[in-house]
């Protein structure tokens, strides 16, 4: 049995990952914000016979994070998955930027994954586990596109932060992987997306399972394709 900690687990890809892990009898600590719609996650936990435990966590709130860290202090974590994210403000072009919204997007999508990785690193080390962060091809530096710029910047930032984390944790034997879940039919991805959350989660689960220190620091799509930065 593995133990997984998944952020942003109340819907979409996060919820699909919770179902995938719990479905094979792995223990899942599933986090969601207090204000989020988490009825489906709570119902799933209630019928999971203890395989799923819901933890209240706003990933950008240090007080919430400290509380979650205390709750999980004695729990080895085999897989830490940074999934929580936001799409950014309504105005996010270079010439019409909601700067407060930009800061909030960076806080959730880029800074929080690193903060969470540091907070739960002792748990991951105790299990000889691994750290996974979901990102996006929209953060690729080779793209000149400027739509959804706050979101793009946040994903470029988290890619670099996770590569840095991978470099620093490699001597300690903790692998770090950046995953692109594909274009998924979620609230963020829209109804026209190609993949269901379950298809994306199943593909990523295979990659997570076989991740070792030799593959640390890579940026992979859900189907295993290596992506450019």
Regions found by a protein language model. Give the residues of each.
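Rossmann-fold scaffold of SDR-type NAD(P)-dependent oxidoreductases
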Residues: 7, 77-85, 109, 133, ...
